């Protein structure tokens, strides 16, 4: 019975820490780049796009396809960085709990 109560207490603590971590993830901002910085996408670690910056040289009619490709690449870069930031926070949160690798709590 004491083990069960201990697990319940640990679960409540984990839930509280998860809420705090979600707030932290909202504050972390990463920037995805492509085209040597011609396209930039800002994103929170919660995968919310916060802004897009496009160099004016890409806004010409004949640059549409290039711009599309650079937007996709910048978004992918931002997504990778946001995912890495989230994984780092999750590892810090769950590192001492002995959870199996890859257990998605986020």
Curated annotation (Swiss-Prot):
Function: Binds to DNA and alters its conformation. May be involved in regulation of gene expression, nucleoid organization and DNA protection.
Family: Belongs to the YbaB/EbfC family.
Listed GO CC annotations: bacterial nucleoid; cytosol
Main location group: cytoplasm
Subunit details: Homodimer.
PANTHER family: NUCLEOID-ASSOCIATED PROTEIN YBAB (PTHR33449:SF1)
Record organism: Rhodopseudomonas palustris (strain HaA2)
Cross-referenced InterPro entries: YbaB-like_sf, YbaB/EbfC
Coiled-coil positions: none
One Pfam family, short name: YbaB_DNA_bd
Source taxonomy: Bacteria, Pseudomonadati, Pseudomonadota, Alphaproteobacteria, Hyphomicrobiales
Any one GO molecular function term: DNA binding
Subcellular location, record wording: Cytoplasm, Nucleoid
Keywords tagged on the record: Cytoplasm, DNA-binding
HAMAP family associated with the record: DNA_YbaB_EbfC (MF_00274)
Record carries keyword Nucleus: no
Record-given protein name: Nucleoid-associated protein RPB_0667
